[in-house]
Amino acid sequence: MTQAAKNARNPIDDTAPERSRPRVMMCPFTNPTNRYIQIQKDLYSSIGYDVVPLSIKGLLKGGLFQLFKPGNILAFHWLEYRPFKRDKGTARLSLTGTLLFAFYCTLMLIGRAKVVYFIHDHAVHDTVGFNRRLSMRIIALVRRLADFRVVHAPDFQAQYNAQYLPHPLYWDVPGQAPATLKKHGERPLFSLLGVIRPYKQIDALLDVWPSECVLSIAGHGTQAYLATLNEIIDKRALRSVVQLDARFLSDAEFAQSIADSDVLILPHTADSMLVSGAFFEAIGRVPLLISRATPFMVSAARKFDNVMLFDDIAELPRIVRSIGESWPAIGRNSGNLAIDEFGWNACRRRYGQFFETVEGHRRDSVEKPVVW
């Protein structure tokens, strides 16, 4: 049983009177493809907040008044994605999305509730050229409009003038059904899970993948990128060792795929996201992780002895083969350490302290620039 299941109270339970609880007005309020948003909502509820959607519909139903209560908080995640629309694997500027983004920026400017902006990415995924540079400018704008910024990677606190808060473990939250752990065999199963997109450089990985090692790739991807990957698999005759399961995985399927993995590979480029969500699904559950040496993963490797790093994709075959030769003795169990760092109770403590700081902050003392 996880620490959260044993020790945490109901995420929506609080002894304070309902009407006295401050509100977190959250955008987005739902995300059907990622449990992160639901976990965040449960965290806010567990530390004493009512969590409500920040949306046009909600504002019209009486939520507008809540914008002007200094004790309330506006929490934004991935707001920089609003001005863009993804089409055939590429994110491009959208007029309707830009107008919606401008609407949310206006709410930040006119309201008295504190604004907390969670920075997840250096740039919007799948943008190139002008759109990529624009997305970075948009992130910079929202950073300036926000009263507080949060990052899940401690090394980026100074760069983004942000507070570090741990990213919660997906498997250590109240109500999370445990996945069935498999018995690890004599031959390790390497896995690459989640969305199949160019920023993960899976094509470069397949170009050097050892033909004697088993690899499972699973997740939703665009037809164009999948065609590229299948072409490499066929060209290098990897069909017998590489399984490409190109479809959306439910939460239960993703969790079970993690549990079935012996080694998880995180090849994301350093200039895309600050942290990989898959890391927080895997750490403490998967015996080994291989990752590109991004700043967060370098710090993770200092804490967890089952995290192995590479700087260049050309180094990957040597690492993969060395694991195969040393398996299963090389596997590690880092569950307790992962709970100490990123578990539900650790997150409740850190988020509670941070939100107390936010509530004590005087909104009218912050100058809000409107140009960028």
Regions found by a protein language model. Give the residues of each.
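Nucleotide-sugar-dependent
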Residues: 265-280, 292-294, 298-300
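Conserved donor-binding/catalytic core segment of Leloir-type glycosyltransferases
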Residues: 181-200, 206-218
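Glycosyltransferase donor-sugar binding loop
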Residues: 215-229, 247
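Conserved acidic donor-binding segment of nucleotide-sugar-dependent glycosyltransferases
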Residues: 303-314, 320-327
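A charged, aromatic-enriched C-terminal amphipathic alpha-helix characteristic of glycosyltransferases
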Residues: 314, 325-360
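Donor nucleotide-sugar binding/catalytic pocket of nucleotide-sugar-dependent glycosyltransferases
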Residues: 139-176
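Nucleotide-activated donor-binding/catalytic signature segment of Leloir-type glycosyltransferases, i.e.
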Residues: 228-252
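Acidic donor-binding loop of glycosyltransferase active sites
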Residues: 256-273, 287
